[in-house]
UniProtKB/Swiss-Prot annotation:
GO terms for cellular component: cytosolic large ribosomal subunit. Residues 1-20 are annotated as: Disordered. It comes from the Bacteria. One of its GO terms (biological process) is translation. Transmembrane segments: none annotated. It holds the Pfam family Ribosomal_L28. Belongs to the bacterial ribosomal protein bL28 family. The gene is rpmB. Keywords: Ribonucleoprotein, Ribosomal protein. GO terms for molecular function: structural constituent of ribosome. This is Large ribosomal subunit protein bL28.
């Protein structure tokens, strides 16, 4: 399962660990992914999404139906 938010599209990015001596070693910054079930009233069923905390806030703002339209427009099965 890839570490990508289904709502925002956020994915891991790379950066550096920095020691006290300022030595740089590569590391990954992972998105804050959560798996969450949402009740979709129009479809009378639950939809399970893998999304970031920011994605949950977007759903709170726009509504699950509007977000599902965007996800399905990208060709994802939900």
């Amino acid at each position: 399962m890839s570490r990508v938010c289904q709502v925002t599209g956020k994915r891991p990015v790379t950066g550096n660990n920095r020691s006290h001596a300022r030595n740089a070693t590569k590391r990954r910054f992972l998105p804050n992914l959560q798996t969450h079930r949402f009740w979709v009233e129009s479809e009378k069923r639950f939809v399970k999404l893998r999304l970031t905390a920011k994605g949950m806030r977007i759903i709170d703002k726009k509504g699950i139906d509007a977000v599902l339209v965007d996800i399905r427009a990208r060709g994802e099965n939900v």
